[in-house]
């Protein structure tokens, strides 16, 4: 297997099976595999070190924060998501945190971006970025592909950090940025595999196998793309008539995913993501999400649905 442990060729065969190789050297697509594979650069999974590398005030729990509000989260999290992350607005809330594996850092205000970079020997070869429309801490309504102007602004922000700390790295690098600061780094793709760009995915395979970057943007390169999430109340397991749902929406989207209930633990405490929907048109992902919400069992609490872009209550 080339792609490990998540295989986009098998997950999205309608997009990639005929164009993207599925053999050759290992290409990490999940954090636990990347941690083992990229031993020299895996320090970036230490979120405390990433914060310190930018000169931020931060420290291990239970050291006292220098300001509030702060975000408290695990120093390491190879599961993904917002597991065990929380916001503390004052010392009373912070004092209730008893977790030796966590650290605190400032709560950043501003736009939240997920940036996918392709690096060759530490040099940025390509970049795609997405802006998240927040619902509440750790949860998002939808993500949208940024335009070139926004990409240029983000590149100016992150490029000095990449040049200083990613020297010699070849592969995918996902950075999460809020405002002017990098909050997380992952040695893998973020969401670019969902774009449906087979030439891009083939180029990533070629980069890992032949150590050269061949991708050139063209008229097929997506300029608009949306990923809509569906969240629901915690402490419940949700299910759906998958065959019926796929019959209704399967051919209308680039990709969708009904999340595995066994992975709900990676979500923030106030809610679990139960599905995502991906397409070049926002109306399409909103339509599919509304249908999914109506078909989910048990019913999703209305407080998770009413704030969503384009939400309409359906009876199915």
Where are each of the predicted segments found?
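ATP-binding N-terminal substructure of ATP-dependent carboxylate-amine bond-forming enzymes
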Residues: 1-52, 282-316
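Short loop/turn hinge sites at secondary-structure boundaries
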Residues: 22-24, 55, 209-214
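Active-site nucleotide/adenylate-binding loops and adjacent lid/helix of ATP-dependent enzymes
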Residues: 29-161, 316
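A short catalytic or substrate-binding loop motif that flags glycine-/basic-rich loops and adjacent residues
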Residues: 107-111, 166-171
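Broad, structure-driven detector of short, well-ordered beta-strand segments within folded domains
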Residues: 113-119, 175-177, 265
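ATP-dependent carboxylate/phosphate-activation module, predominantly the ATP-grasp catalytic core
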Residues: 117-167, 179-227
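A short glycine-rich, hydrophobically flanked beta-strand micro-motif that places a catalytic Asp/Glu
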Residues: 167-180, 276-277
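Peripheral (often C-terminal) accessory segments that flank ATP-dependent C-N-forming ligase machineries
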Residues: 206-316
